[in-house]
From Swiss-Prot:
Organism, as annotated: Cercopithecine herpesvirus 9 (strain DHV)
Cellular component per GO, a single term: host cell
Taxonomy, superkingdom: Viruses
Record family assignment: Belongs to the alphaherpesvirinae envelope protein US9 family.
GO terms classed as biological process: intracellular transport of virus
Protein's name in the database: Envelope protein US9 homolog
Short sequence motif Di-leucine internalization motif: positions: 12-13
Length: 77
């Protein structure tokens, strides 16, 4: 069973704003208060997706006796 930090990390990851890679097309989800060219998480106005994932990865490696879990996300454009 996942601990609280794992559950929060997955919840934050699921709340990501997904934008299309083509800058000429309309994004699937438009945020009124964030830059549409970047992918940010709903709990942070300045943490990018890559920074968030890097922080979670560092946290996971520091945990002792943790069970590695694989989470797969499908993003449709």
């Amino acid at each position: 069973m996942a601990d609280k930090s794992d559950s929060e990390a997955v919840a934050l990851l699921m709340e990501a704003i997904v934008t299309t890679p083509d800058t000429n097309s309309e994004p699937q989800y438009q945020s009124q208060h964030r830059d549409l060219q970047e992918c940010y998480y709903s709990d942070s106005d300045n943490e990018k997706a890559t920074e968030f994932l890097r922080r979670i990865g560092k946290h996971q490696h520091k945990k002792k006796n943790s069970v590695k879990k694989r989470v797969t996300f499908l993003v449709y454009f």
